[in-house]
UniProtKB/Swiss-Prot annotation:
Annotated source species: Burkholderia pseudomallei (strain K96243)
SUPFAM superfamilies xref list: Actin-like ATPase domain (SSF53067), Heat shock protein 70kD (HSP70), C-terminal subdomain (SSF100934), Heat shock protein 70kD (HSP70), peptide-binding domain (SSF100920)
Keywords: ATP-binding, Chaperone, Nucleotide-binding
Record's keyword annotation contains Chaperone: yes
Name of the featured protein: Chaperone protein HscA homolog
Length: 622
């Protein structure tokens, strides 16, 4: 009989084999994949030694496609079928992207997320992104020599629920198991913090091709705590390109609408090259021969470019101020500013950041790679490859408050913005009318006091509530945000146990500038919002009291004499007349008068109920 072999603790090969997991930065302009090898995170190159994969997909007829560098090189000759900057379309509706600057595509009017018509059929941003992710997955498996157990994919901190869900769908389509969606600034902080052993308050300024994020983090002995996040989900390096593009056209006396799609793409490519050249040189040339035979030849100086894009630079500082305010710190408290994203190579950006924070930004890690490196570290940890130096904790946040609609169109915030995730919060609500057997749950996102000023995320109904008097039912509504920033909502009637739930998957996400506008509006209109909320609350309470009093009069009006009945009727009529108005103080006064004027009536009703309950019963039965 063969003896069973038992290895010494920690020596058995199979259980302690490293599980292969990667970090992927799915970028607007470029994407890349990284992995931890020999305890060091590194970006994985392709066969030609190139780390960056252009986020470009060209569709050919009969199912053919080119991805990355090959597609980028052919973008000018086939612009309608070559999809670039697809990240800007993730989770967006057709109405939100039709104004996309100089986009040569034919957008298809389909329900939910925008679709793009190509020679190979209609494609969604999820499908296009999946092509890029599948290419990176194949690169990783070829380099590492085995299948992946999963990936951590980075997303802008200001991506909303729909955009995050679209990213997960693209990964699933690409054959990737998503271990975590990780906010890009947080990934950068992980890479920087672990690389440098940094501690203290840090700002991560992340300007990519299509999005801007600013996060304030506190690094303390391996704990990465995000204190606040701000940003603009529709601002990135592409916008700098388009401003310079429009400038070059204006100087030549041309308009974009008059150019052929291939000329638009060619000129954009040349303009982008000039922008990148200005990071190292005081001036750059734009030389283009259009399909009409006309030649454009211009010299762009760094000063001209800086003046041109100054409004965009200032747009990044607004969310920066808000994030600092939310974190309750000042620019002077920040120990270092980490730059992320290829667009931060522009001198105009580095100068603005240095001026605002009073110190030069940290640039010792490649801004194109730092996000993927941080994601790789997190992926390695989530895959179970923990080593002695991996005792660190990540605490990320949600960027906007999540709430529920209450009577009168008011918003009751369940999870406030900048709450650490994962998080679950619950609150109890009740019914508004007697005999109410259903409740509509309306999930909203934003900082304002009224539902009409916030973003609607989802609606669902809780049915089967036992009929009770108004206010007797107890409905517990629980909001749960997972580590990927995705929301689920549960409602439960406490007496009967009736339940309903929804995983929030809106058909498409927030429009351009919506999140930044929501926050800005909430600060500008806080006083107006509070007055509006006070009015709505007064109106709701007035309506509740009028209906309750009228129901009581129908049931027990005989408890009042003619004079008392006339007094109550007058108070009800007065409150009913005032309730639709806009004088909250007058409504409150009339509500208080009716409540006090019916105190004696309520006491008589209580006595009647007690007598009815005790009728025919002996003392020892009570």
């Amino acid at each position: 009989m063969a003896l069973l072999q038992i290895s010494e603790p920690g020596m058995a090969p199979a259980p302690h084999q490293r599980r292969l997991a990667v970090g992927i930065d799915l970028g607007t302009t470029n994407s890349l994949v990284a992995a931890v090898r020999n305890s060091i995170p590194e970006a994985l190159p392709d066969d030609a030694g190139r780390v960056l994969l252009p986020s470009v997909v060209r569709y050919l007829d009969k199912g053919g496609r080119r991805i990355g560098h090959a597609a980028k090189e052919e973008a000018a000759i086939d612009p309608r079928n070559t999809i670039v900057s697809v990240k800007r379309f993730m989770g967006r509706g057709k109405a939100e992207v039709e104004g996309a600057a100089n986009a040569p595509y034919e957008f298809v009017d389909a329900p939910g997320m925008v679709q793009i018509r190509t020679v190979d059929g209609v494609k969604s941003p999820v499908e296009v992104s999946a092509e890029i992710l599948a290419t990176l997955r194949q690169r990783a498996e070829d380099t590492l020599g085995d299948d992946l157990v999963g990936a951590v994919i980075t997303v802008p901190a200001y991506f909303d629920d729909a955009q995050r869900q679209a990213t997960k769908d693209a990964a699933r389509l690409a054959g990737l198991n998503v271990l975590r969606l990780l906010n890009e600034p947080t990934a950068a902080a992980i890479a920087y913090g672990l690389d440098n052993g940094a501690e203290g308050l840090y700002a991560v300024y992340d300007l990519g091709g299509g999005t801007f994020d600013l996060s304030i983090l506190k690094l303390t002995k391996g704990v990465f705590e995000v204190l606040a996040a701000g940003g603009d989900s529709a601002l990135g390096g592409d916008d700098f390109d388009h401003l310079l593009f429009e400038h070059v056209l204006a100087q030549a006396g041309l308009e974009a609408a008059a150019l052929a799609p291939e000329d638009v793409r060619l000129l954009l490519d040349r303009v982008r090259g000039a922008k990148e050249a200005l990071s190292a040189a005081p001036q750059a040339r734009v030389d283009v021969k259009l399909s009409t035979g006309e030649k454009l030849a211009q010299t762009i100086t760094r000063d001209t470019f800086a003046a041109l894009v100054e409004p965009l630079v200032q747009r990044t500082l607004g969310p920066t101020r808000k994030a600092l305010r939310d974190a309750q710190v000042s620019a002077a408290d920040i120990k270092g500013v980490v730059l992320v994203g290829g667009a931060t190579r522009m001198p105009v950006i580095r100068d603005a950041v240095a001026k605002y924070f009073g110190q030069p930004p940290l640039v010792n890690l490649d801004p194109d790679q730092v996000v993927a490196l941080g994601a790789a570290i997190q992926a390695d940890l989530l895959a179970g490859n923990r080593s002695g130096g991996d005792d660190w904790l990540l605490l990320d946040v949600i960027p906007l408050s999540l709430g529920v609609e209450t009577m009168g169109g008011l918003v009751e915030k369940i999870i406030p913005r900048n709450s650490t995730i994962p998080v679950a919060r619950a609150q109890e609500f009740t019914t508004f009318k007697d005999g109410q057997t259903a409740m509509a749950i309306h999930v909203v996102q934003g900082e304002r006091e009224l539902v009409s000023d916030c973003r609607s995320l989802a609606r669902f109904e809780l049915r089967g509530i036992p009929p009770m008097t108004a206010g007797a039912a107890r409905i517990r509504v629980t909001y749960q945000v997972d580590a990927d920033g995705l929301l689920s909502v549960f409602a439960r009637e406490q007496h009967s146990g009736v339940e309903a739930s929804v995983v929030v998957k809106p058909s498409y996400g927030l429009g351009d500038d919506d999140i930044a506008r929501m926050l800005e509006d909430s600060f500008k209109t806080a006083e107006v919002d509070m007055r509006a909320r006070a009015l709505r609350e007064a109106q709701v309470e007035a309506q509740r009291l009028v209906e309750a009093t009228e129901a009581a009069l129908v049931a027990d009006g005989d408890l009042l004499d003619a004079s008392e009945r006339a007094t109550v009727d007058a108070l009800v009529a007065s409150l009913r007349a005032l309730a639709p108005g806009d004088d909250a103080d007058a409504i409150d006064t009339a509500t208080k008068a009716l409540a006090e004027g019916t105190d004696e009536f309520a006491a008589r009703r209580m006595d009647k109920s007690i007598k009815r309950a005790l009728a025919g019963r002996k003392l020892d039965e009570i």
